[in-house]
Every structure is written in C-alpha cells, then in structure tokens.
Design a protein with these regions (language model features):
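Jelly-roll (double-stranded beta-helix
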Residues: 2-204
Length: 204
C-alpha cells in the first residue's frame, strides 16, 4: 500500500493509511477522480486487483467506468446523491452511509442530484470472496479477522490510533475495540491472496 505505515505504538499487524498521502487519479473515462485507500495484491493495476477500496469524487453527470468481471459496493459519503441507471434500471442513491451493491461491468449512467459527490467504492473480482461493507457508529468490538476501517466523518479511535476524516487502518490480526465518533466504514476482508503481502513490507 503506497504510504502505508505501522503506528509506532502498535503491533505490526496494523497499518495506518493516512488520507493526506493519497494521490488523486483520473477515472479511465475521465468522469471523475479516485483516491485508492488499499488494494490487493500490492501494486496491482485496475485489471489485476483481487479487491480494491477507494474514495471516488464525481463532479459531473455521465457514465461510470466499466470493470469486466468485477462486483462493487458503493456508499455515498458526501453530497446530495446520484440518480443512477444500472443496466437500464433506475437506482436512486440519495442517502449517505448506506452501502449499495451492483455489478461493475453493467453500463451505469449517473445524474447528480445536487452537485458533486464522494463515494466509498469497494470492488472485487467476481467469483472471489466478497468483502462485507458496514457503516457503524459508537463502540464495538471487531473480531480477529482482516478488515479495513475508514473514518468517514467525526473520526475514530482503535488499536491505539486516532483516525481523522478519511484516514484508514488495515487490521490483519487480533480483536480490537473501535470507538467510532461518527460514521465509520468497516470493510471485512477475507484472507484473500495478496493480503499478507499487503502488510509484509510495512512491518517492523
């Protein structure tokens, strides 16, 4: 993960992914920009990832990029929302922090409801193990399983680390308690190929 680093007080199974270190990359169709949070295997391009989590900024109406054999979960995190047409069927996305699933390779057109939006985008290869996406608030215990935690608004504390808005923490080991001061995404990741390598170079 570019920019990932272990927190100095933390065990090596935890990798901090600061929002400030992400680079904006234009969509392949030019309709917006994306900032990758994490992906596996490390260094995989858009044609080779097993899973990928990013924040996507949509500034204008138009089609979404198509990703063959990819499933996606989209969560609106900023803005009024979108009126989508997915494979000819209308889908209104106008409520923040509600994950919505749809195929990544079906023609999808977007009409903004009231200006630019930001979406949390989780994608994975069809036929592989699907990540889970939940938006939580308050205090809860996360089990010992791979997960990516992204503070969406209000910040969060876990594993001795304080997350600001859009900061993320990759967890690959022990139980931990999450204190989510505002909406916080928890992306459950199976031990898919590439996950161990994702944190290997970040460990002490």
């Amino acid at each position: 993960v570019a920019g990932g680093r272990p927190h100095p007080r933390d065990r090596p199974v935890t990798v901090l992914l600061p929002a400030a270190e992400r680079v904006a990359v234009a969509w392949k169709n030019g309709g917006g920009v994306t900032r990758e949070i994490a992906a596996a295997p490390p260094g995989a391009d858009m044609a080779a990832f097993a899973w990928r989590v990013s924040l996507a900024e949509v500034a204008a109406d138009g089609p979404f990029s198509a990703f063959p054999e990819v499933e996606r979960t989209l969560t609106l995190v900023e803005g009024a929302g979108m009126d989508l047409t997915v494979g000819g069927r209308r889908r209104l996305v106008d409520t923040r922090y509600v994950p919505q699933d749809f195929p990544g390779d079906v023609p999808t057109d977007c009409r903004l409801l009231g200006g630019p939006v930001v979406n949390l985008n989780v994608m994975w290869r069809r036929g592989g193990a699907a990540p889970t996406v939940a938006v939580v608030r308050g205090r809860l215990r996360l089990p010992a399983a791979p997960a990516l935690v992204v503070a969406l608004d209000g910040g969060a504390d876990l594993a001795g680390v304080r997350l600001g808005r859009y900061d993320a923490l990759l967890l690959t080991g022990e139980d931990t308690v999450l204190h989510a001061h505002g909406p916080t995404a928890v992306v459950g990741l199976t031990p898919a190929r590439g996950l161990a390598a994702l944190t290997h170079d970040e460990r002490h």
